[in-house]
Amino acid sequence: MNRDKRFELIARANSERICGIAERILDDAATAVEVVKKPVCGMIMMRFRDTAEKCVFNIGEVLVTEAEVRIGSELGYAMVMGRDAEAALAGAIIDAAVESGHPLTPEIIDLLRSEEERLKEELQKTWAEVATTKVDFEVMA
């Protein structure tokens, strides 16, 4: 799993699951976690690509929380939507753990893959609900 994909999944993952594995990393006496940037809230511009003309435009600002940590020489970073300092810090810890080759890395990757599957299922469910509202203009004519 590449780092971009990991960032995306950490940002959208269930915060309880992310925080649980981050706690286990913190409990490991052999792993020293240094907080480089405490969780801070900020705003980012959410961008969207128009499906018809393929042009990008700004929808509006979104509240996010970001954090950065270091494990050994490896930096970990995470940004999550909303005001959730615990999830941002946990995400950064998980990212740094994977980058540093922490013993829990395989379990972290498994957790992120299961979150990816859950997110895909949620998206399919949403599309199925939206499909029932689709109007077929050919039939109406």
Name the predicted role of every residue range.
Residues L26-I71, Y77-A78:
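Structured beta-strand/loop patches that form or line metal/cofactor-binding pockets in enzymes
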Residues M1-D27:
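Charge-rich, low-complexity N-terminal segments
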Residues A29, E99-A141:
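Cysteine/selenocysteine-centered motifs that mediate thiol-based redox chemistry or coordinate metal-sulfur cofactors
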Residues M1-D4, A13, V33-V40, M45-F48, ...:
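A generic short-segment signal for beta-strand/edge and adjacent turn/coil regions
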Residues N2, T51-K54, W127-E129:
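Short, functionally important structural connectors and interaction interfaces within domains
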Residues R49, G82, A141:
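A broadly conserved detector of short glycine/acidic/proline-rich loop/turn motifs that flank catalytic sites
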Residues E8, R17-C19, P39, D50-K54, ...:
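Short secondary-structure boundary micro-motifs
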Residues E74-D110:
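A hydrophobic, small-residue-rich beta->alpha segment in the mid-to-C-terminal subdomain
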